[in-house]
């Protein structure tokens, strides 16, 4: 399972750990992903999505129905 938010498309980024002595080592910044079940009233069922916390806020703002329409338009099976 890839580390990608299904709503926002956030992916891991790469950067550096920087020590006090200014030594740099490569690291990954991972998105804050959660497997979350959302109740879809119109379909009378739960939908499981892998979303970041930013994606959860977008779902709270727009509603799960609008987000699912957008995901299905992109070709994701939900």
Curated annotation (Swiss-Prot):
GO BP annotations, alphabetical order: translation
A single cellular component GO annotation: cytosolic large ribosomal subunit
Domain of life assignment: Bacteria
GO molecular function annotation: structural constituent of ribosome
Keyword terms: Ribonucleoprotein, Ribosomal protein
InterPro entries registered for this protein in UniProt: Ribosomal_bL28, Ribosomal_bL28/bL31-like_sf, Ribosomal_bL28_bact-type, Ribosomal_bL28_sf
Family the UniProt entry places it in: Belongs to the bacterial ribosomal protein bL28 family.
Full protein name: Large ribosomal subunit protein bL28
Source organism: Psychrobacter arcticus (strain DSM 17307 / VKM B-2377 / 273-4)
Encoding gene per record: rpmB
């Amino acid at each position: 399972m890839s580390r990608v938010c299904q709503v926002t498309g956030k992916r891991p980024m790469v950067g550096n750990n920087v020590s006090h002595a200014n030594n740099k080592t490569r690291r990954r910044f991972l998105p804050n992903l959660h497997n979350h079940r959302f109740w879809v009233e119109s379909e009378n069922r739960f939908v499981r999505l892998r979303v970041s916390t930013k994606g959860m806020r977008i779902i709270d703002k727009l509603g799960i129905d609008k987000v699912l329409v957008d995901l299905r338009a992109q070709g994701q099976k939900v």
